[in-house]
Amino acid sequence: MWRDTAAMPEYGRLEGDVRTDVLVIGGGMAGILCAHFLRQAGMDCVLAEADRLCAGTTGNTTAKITSQHGLVYDGLLRRFGAEKAGMYLHANEAALARYRGMCREIDCGFEEKDAFVYSLDDRGKLEKELAALEKLGFHAGFTDKLPLPFPVAGAVRFERQAQFDPLRFAAAAARGLRAYEHTPVRRLEGTSAVTDRGTIRAEKVIVATHFPFLNRHGSYFLKMYQHRSYVLALENAANVGGMYVDEAAEGLSFRNAQGMLLLGGGSHRTGKQGGGWRELEAFAKRHYPRAHIRYRWAAQDCMTLDGVPYIGPYSARTENLYVATGFNKWGMTSAMAAAMLLTEMVQGKRADDAPV
């Protein structure tokens, strides 16, 4: 769907050896934003992508820009305390604000929308989330009336969140970068990246490859798992007016784009059984019988065990190597927050061990 409305810039593959200040590995939203901000700061930066820019998860997003990541704040407050939970909230609010500012100059269908997390049957969960947000100084609303085709126990509302066309935005941010497509990094030797047709020698490296590929350090394969979800883009369906997601992991999400309803769900842990396309198709047929499926796609997301992305030094033993991963299905604000933090780190404006 997004690929039909965006013309991504094209870059050739690396041929020969190059040097740079910073190498960014991975050409999704996080990698593009890192390279974009470093270029703006006057640093020499190379972006290496194994396929095409935005060929992975970024091209298969529902593109909600929100600091409301499910009912996350009650858990963060209990697990990490008010200071760190507040840091998570403020980092994502800052990411939303950065998108808002950039989108004034980029034609990408940016629209402010209220975001809602609803529960079918557990009002208590919603009340706990509202109490946690109040402790963090954030005003959220409550409603039990949503324009969805089923009753809910209620919903937590964040006002003035946003949605956009992610590839039109990414295409604008990626123009003018020193980038190489079809250039998979086979291994790292310190901060030098070996590819099929040349080596990129950098002072610092940011790994933004969805799942970190360097298994010798960081043990990310032990700290994350994969979750698969599905989306139908329906013509002649309802205009729901906002962005809605079930607090349950297997629930449904709704938002409109390009005159269509994006219906998400059927989620399951990768390798396990789940509802998949059949569940979404049955729901659409039952509740939107006149709708027509224009597009369909699936996405696979990296989920962290504690619900917090990994953004910062790759590991304690890898100097000048940084990572952004584990966005827990909230890739748009997480990618922006990661780019803002990591580009400050590589410029020395933020200590590597500084709190987020």
Language model features with spans:
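N-terminal Rossmann-like FAD-binding beta1-loop-alpha1 element of flavoenzymes
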Residues: 18-47
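Glycine-rich active-site loop/strand segments that organize a redox cofactor
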Residues: 60-91
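Glycine-rich FAD pyrophosphate-binding loop
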Residues: 40-60
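Flavin (FAD/FMN) cofactor-binding and adjacent substrate-gating region
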Residues: 1-4, 71-78, 97-169
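C-terminal catalytic lobe of FAD-dependent flavoproteins
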Residues: 248, 277-279, 288-356
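Flavin-dependent oxidoreductases
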Residues: 188-256
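Extreme N-terminal leader/targeting segments of oxidoreductases
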Residues: 1-22
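Helical element adjacent to the flavin cofactor pocket in flavoenzyme catalytic cores
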Residues: 130-133, 155-204, 208
